[in-house]
Curated annotation (Swiss-Prot):
InterPro entries: Pantoate_hydroxy_MeTrfase, Pyrv/PenolPyrv_kinase-like_dom, Pyrv_kinase-like_dom_sf
Subunit structure: Homodecamer; pentamer of dimers.
UniProt-annotated binding residues for 3-methyl-2-oxobutanoate: 46-47, 85, 114
PANTHER family: 3-METHYL-2-OXOBUTANOATE HYDROXYMETHYLTRANSFERASE
UniProtKB keywords: Cytoplasm, Magnesium, Metal-binding, Pantothenate biosynthesis, Transferase
Gene Ontology cellular component annotations, sorted alphabetically: cytoplasm
Reaction it catalyzes: 3-methyl-2-oxobutanoate + (6R)-5,10-methylene-5,6,7,8-tetrahydrofolate + H2O = 2-dehydropantoate + (6S)-5,6,7,8-tetrahydrofolate
Protein name: 3-methyl-2-oxobutanoate hydroxymethyltransferase
A GO molecular-function descriptor: magnesium ion binding
Pathway(s) the chain acts in: Cofactor biosynthesis; (R)-pantothenate biosynthesis; (R)-pantoate from 3-methyl-2-oxobutanoate: step 1/2
Cofactor descriptive note: Binds 1 Mg(2+) ion per subunit.
Length: 269
C-alpha cells in the first residue's frame, strides 16, 4: 500500500509543480472510493450542512456533527490526508479553538483543521501552531460569513480587496498555516496568492493556477439541482462513481480542470 499522504508531501508537491487532488467526503464509503482513486486530501467540510442536512447555510453545523463525520471518513482514509472544518463560532478565541481542534483530532482523527478568515484569525492560527495543531486557512468567499456578505458571490475583484487578500495570505502563512483554501476569487488573484506563499493553495472556483483543487462530492457527481459555474459533473460520460473520481483526479493532475468555463476573471462575468 502506498504510504499515507503527509503535509511535507504536499509541500513537496507544490515545489515540484505537481497538482493536489482534493474532494469533500462525509462518510466512510465515499472516503474509501476517493482514497482508492488517488485523492491526496479529503476535506470533511461544514458543507455537510448543505448537502447532508439540507440546510440553506453551514451555520447550523456543530462541533459534534463535525467530529462524527470526520471519524467516519478517517476510518476509510488509508492514504489520503484528512482535513476537517472548524464549524461556525467554534474558534472565536485561541483557547476555544484549541479545545475544538482537540476534539476533531482526538475524537475525529483529523490531521489538519481548517478555519475561515484572514488577519483577524492570526492569533488563533499562531496559538494552534504553537500547540502542534496543523492549520489550513480559507480566504475568498467564506460561507460562515454569509449573513454579513448577504449572498454567495465572487470575492476580491476590486484592487483594494485583492491587495488585502494577498497580504492576508502572506500573514496566515507567516503565522503557521500549512495549507490555504481559496474560494470563488478571480483566477488572476489566485495565481498571485499562490506565487506569494510557500504553502500549497487549494482552489474552489479560483482557477487552474492553484496548487490543488477541491470540489464538493455531491457537486462533482452532478447530484446538486443547480451546479455552481466552477463545478463539473464528472459522472456524466463515465460508467460509474469510481470512474468519475478517477477522471477528476486525472484532470486535476493534468491541469485540465478547472478550465476557462469553470473560472472567474477580474473583468469577466
Amino acid at each position: 500500500m502506498t504510504d499515507p499522504v503527509t503535509l511535507p508531501d504536499l509541500l513537496a508537491m507544490k515545489r515540484r509543480g505537481e497538482k493536489i487532488a482534493c474532494l469533500t467526503a462525509y462518510d466512510a464509503s465515499s472516503a474509501a472510493l476517493q482514497d482508492e482513486a488517488g485523492i491526496e486530501v479529503i476535506l470533511v467540510g461544514d458543507s455537510l450542512g448543505n448537502v447532508i442536512q439540507g440546510q440553506p447555510t453551514t451555520l447550523s453545523v456543530t462541533l459534534d456533527h463535525m467530529v462524527y463525520h470526520t471519524a467516519c471518513v478517517q476510518r476509510a482514509a488509508r492514504r489520503a490526508l484528512v482535513l476537517a472544518d472548524l464549524p461556525f463560532l467554534s474558534y472565536c478565541t485561541p483557547e476555544q479553538a484549541v479545545r475544538s481542534a482537540a476534539r476533531l483530532i482526538r475524537d475525529g482523527g483529523a490531521q489538519v483543521v481548517k478555519l475561515e478568515g484572514g488577519r483577524e484569525r492570526l492569533d488563533v492560527v499562531r496559538f494552534l501552531t504553537e500547540q502542534n495543531v496543523p492549520v489550513c486557512g480559507h480566504l475568498g468567499l467564506q460561507p460562515q460569513a454569509i449573513h454579513r456578505l448577504g449572498r454567495y458571490a465572487l470575492q476580491g475583484r476590486d484592487a483594494e480587496s485583492a491587495c488585502r487578500m494577498v497580504e492576508d495570505a502572506r500573514q496566515l502563512a507567516e503565522a503557521g498555516a500549512m495549507l490555504l483554501v481559496l474560494e470563488c476569487i478571480p483566477w488572476e488573484l489566485a495565481q498571485e496568492i499562490t506565487a506569494a506563499v510557500d504553502i500549497p493553495t487549494i482552489g474552489i472556483g479560483a482557477g487552474r493556477h492553484c496548487d490543488g483543487q477541491v470540489l464538493v462530492w455531491q457537486d462533482m457527481l452532478g447530484m446538486s439541482a443547480r451546479l455552481p459555474r466552477f463545478c463539473k459533473d464528472f459522472l456524466a460520460g463515465n460508467a460509474g462513481v469510481r470512474e468519475a473520481v478517477s477522471a477528476y483526479v486525472r484532470e486535476v493532475k493534468a491541469g485540465i480542470f478547472p478550465g476557462d468555463r469553470h473560472s472567474f476573471g477580474r473583468d469577466g462575468p
